Amino acid sequence: IWRQDDRMTVLLRYAGLTPTPEEQKDEVFPFLTKILNELKTKSRITIWKMIYSAFYRLLEWYNDPLMYHAFGAIVHQRNNKEIKPKTRKEILDTIEKMAEYKPKDDKNDYSNWGEDLFNYLLLSNVAFCWKRWPYRYSFEMHRQVEAWSIEHIFARNQKNLDDKELKEWLGNDYSKSVFDEYRKEYNEGKGKGKGKGDDWLAKKLGSRYPTTEDNSIGNLALLPKDANSSLNNKLFEGKREAVSEWARNSWTEYWAPPATEAVFMKSLPGLKMTDPYWSEEDKKAYRNSMSKDIGSFID
């Protein structure tokens, strides 16, 4: 089974040997079929020159920090059906278009998110690594992700916590009577769209729990879907501990893209590392960091 971002697929597509949509749909080996069709009008030497010329150009770009990250971002962006840019200028022009994402006026990027937001967050990760060369964004790890999601960095729970989960959240402030109080508040708001359990948690946890849901880009990060699911019902500090554990285990369990890791480790410029929550100041610093990294990358 071939994939759009496999190495041989990228090489052959870049060499101009891209199968037609019909061939891609109907053929088991569409690129082999394409080459066989090309051999009807071209010599083997000509086909071979097309392939090795593309290979050496890609090899040159692999060793170029800017082109490695720019070309990789284009290959792995959403809705990338064919690689059109062939020259350095065309590739960098395409990157500039990826950087044109504008946060939603209603600050509801999460509910409205699509390929533009995904591509922008991917670009922010790529630019983050480029700025820290020889640190590379691992497109190899990226390709192993079966499905992507957008994670709330700091989220209201919106779910029914059991006694074990509430104890994990409250620590020494937990007791059976406190759990009963939470259950009462939760049940009163259940089915009425009132989220009274969330309001109760906000009062109990203070700054560690958001008073309102924030769907703006300053509260969103790119994460594999399975990794996102594993963070279910965790506060910010719980997510931070989980991501730190993944890193210590060399990402064998789950993988977080570098900029996402930096968010939860609070290692980006301007983030308050000692605060166990995601503040408004952190969101602003995160947005500025993304904007500066991407701005430097496309400049």
Where are these regions (language model features)?
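Flexible coil/loop and intrinsically disordered segments
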Residues: 1-299
